[in-house]
Amino acid sequence: NLGSQLIVHESQEAIFCRDGQALDLFGPGRYTLETQQLPLLEKTYNLPTDTEGTFHSEVYFINKTEQMNIKWGTDSRVQYIEPTYGFPLSIGASGEMSLRAEDSRKLLLKLVGTESYLGQQQLTNYFRSFLMTRVKTYIAQVMKTNSINIFEIDENLTMFSNAIKNLLGGDFADYGVALEQFFVTTILKPDGDRQYEKFKELHFRQYADIAEAKLRQQTEIINAETEAQKTVIDSKAQATK
């Protein structure tokens, strides 16, 4: 009722709702609920001006802190054409992310609905199907667009993570949520697959051949320099006789 006290703690926002409408929004502080504090509610419902006036409504408190260490992982393998060698490949991925409520009103209307509580686990469950669909699409897209070699993916995880985060950011924003961090920590490769192992051997054999060629070249240079030094020494020895 009017005249009640509303306390909103730091890192919180409070939203007044009535009949399914998200109306007035309160930041951190202590409030006495009077008509001047509820402009949208008063405008919509023509509230009574006496402080004893009562009305039915709900207040939702939104935690604005960053929710960290939320684990994610693909529920099935992502199939795509490996960009370097052009063979079909299926991989999985997993990692962690952190989310933060950015637009409390949008979050409330799109996700909370009539629920009385929405914690980190519930939030993760809400986004599970949405996240799996987007992430699998973006994994294949980023691998192809950036021509990331599957055999060199581990050294490119930071770039890979940032690229997927940038693509996912707008999707989460549609729900009033900011994707603060997104990390790909593990890539599940098809180890043991005959075709994968064949190209893996080819890839690393190329590096081994290059390394051996460089080693032979360096050895030849050293041998040539050594022979040149021997020639100089022999010449000096002959000159002193």
Model-inferred region functions:
Residues N1-L107, S116:
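Hydrophobic membrane-anchoring helix/hairpin
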Residues Y60-K241:
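Elongated, amphipathic alpha-helices that form coiled-coils and helical stalk/scaffold elements used
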